[in-house]
Amino acid sequence: MEGELTFRPATKADASALAVLVDIAGEGLPAHLWSTLKVPGQSILEVGRERAAREEGGFSYRNAIVAEIGGEIAACLVGYRLDDPYDLGNLAEIPELVRPLVFLEGKAPGSWYVNVLATFPEFRRQGIG
């Protein structure tokens, strides 16, 4: 590991790195979901970046902490406290692929939810996670 390992709250400027790390953690599931949201001329990663740059929502830079080594983003954690009571909302409006995850979230109201924990490949096996 070259450079000092530091942790800090994510900023909007980190949205691109967060989108890539979220997709790494989700093993392509986020990219699949983002592909259903993109408009013509927009890349899947741009959708992820826009979602990470939001001020609200579970996947927002406001819920993320980044790990840096030598000033370079190496990893991230996205997490937040689940609402209590937890409102599942209208499951029909949620992509079918993630409905089971939302249902499981509803089983643990008020708990701390780790949505994403991911490290870029070149920084793995260094104890960051």
Q: What residue spans do the PLM features occupy?
A:
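Conserved N-terminal entry element of GNAT/NAT acetyltransferase domains
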Residues: 1-16, 24, 31-36
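Glycine-rich acetyl-CoA-binding "A-motif" of GNAT/NAT acetyltransferases
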Residues: 72-75
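Conserved GNAT-fold acetyl-CoA-binding loop/helix
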Residues: 26-52, 63, 86-89
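Hydrophobic adenine-recognition pocket in adenosine-nucleotide-binding enzymes
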Residues: 10, 117-119
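Cytosolic beta-strand hydrophobic patch enriched in CBS
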Residues: 64-68
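Short loop/turn motifs at secondary-structure junctions and domain boundaries
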Residues: 55-61
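Conserved acyl-donor/pantetheine-binding loop and adjacent beta-alpha core of acyl/acetyltransferases
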Residues: 78-116
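Conserved acetyl-CoA pyrophosphate-binding loop and the N-cap/start of the following alpha-helix
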Residues: 123, 127-128
